[in-house]
Amino acid sequence: MYQYQQLAQLLKNEILNGNLQKGDKLPSIRDLVEQYGVNKDTVQRALRSLKEESFIYAVKKSGYYVLKNADVNKEPSLEGDYSQLPIEDLRICFNQSLASAKDLRLSKKEQASGMNELIDALMPVLEEYGVYATKEQLVITTGTQQALYILLQLIQGKKILLEQPTYARMNELVRHLEIPYETITRQIDGGIDLVHLEELFASGEFSLFYTISRFHNPLGGSYSEATKKKIVELASRYSVYIVEDDYMADFVEGNATPLHYYDMDGRVIYVKSFSSILFAALKIGIVVLPKELVEPFAMRKQWMDYDSNVMMQKTFTLFVENGMFDKHRKEMVESYMAKSKHAKRWLLDSGFHDGTLHGTQWVFEHSKQVEQKLKEYNLVPEKLDEYYISKKAPILYRVDLAKIREI
């Protein structure tokens, strides 16, 4: 964490703990420099960060004032934590992109497949995820949803197989595009019934299977390595494409690999966005395609979207090339692992024994006892009905303990 982020967190804690109330004036920049032993630039960046998070506001020729009230008696609550976003680094990269905007002209191929510089920068990143491919197999997209939409248009003729529950927007795409489908249950522990999966593949009715292999959304679990190998083997045997959504690849530690790692026959289409490690507004995704699908995919993308936001592509290129992405990712993984350990401890200390915890994702069946106990902690669980394409979905609930500030 940068020094300005540490200072921002200290000041934020003063607000959250009630030591600074709404309307209170913060110490002057000079006083903060003396109090915390940092330079003026660090203080200004910390204040800018707090302003962007709407904790404080500036009054011209007067100073900075607290914008938010803090309820010191408030129990842990679910709210996004933006303190670790590399806003300043991204701003620097964006300004550099803006300065060179007149030179950002893409070739016809780049308009379809993405900026060459960005693809080159992401090749080693993909290898860290366990994805090995040629440059020609990569296409930059405007986020995951665009990639999924194109794939659903491209691979037609048969039904698609959806794991359930799954990414809500994939359910919406399939429903609104009126694509024929069947479902298979993704188990709460992260696994899947491989016997049933083979029966479905062997029927010859499916062209595509959509799955989230690691850190499943919404359940949180991951396939075992043996399960991944078997799924890829079945896809190869029965000529079914797998669309592997690996949106949380950045948070994987150890030797866990994606399905794509085991694919020797070009059956796995790897889809990755960077919103989970950065923020959704970035709208940059990457797809790794079997060679026979690259040209038709890129052509359809160009029909929809002449070129994915060039400024954002250049900004992200600089962010990766300058080592900022790698540094930020390591910080986020370290933070996530710490929160996972704290989440497990908090769950036990709070007396919750129902459900399953994967990382920070706690999934459980609804009960009045759990609901009542959650109210004591001012927690509102998320009902997972939107993650099912059928209205007759099982009643599962989730709490993302990573978003509890006290964790």
Q: How would you describe each model-predicted region?
A:
Residues 1-110, 298, 302-309, 313, ...:
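N-terminal basic, amphipathic alpha-helical segments
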Residues 38, 55, 179, 240, ...:
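Short glycine/serine/threonine/alanine-rich loop segments
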Residues 61, 263-296:
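Active-site PLP attachment segment
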Residues 105-238, 250-262:
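Conserved core of the PLP fold type I
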Residues 122, 286, 313-321:
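Helix-loop "lid/cap" segments that line or gate small-molecule binding pockets
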Residues 139, 180-184, 269, 355, ...:
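General small-molecule cofactor/ligand-binding pocket signal
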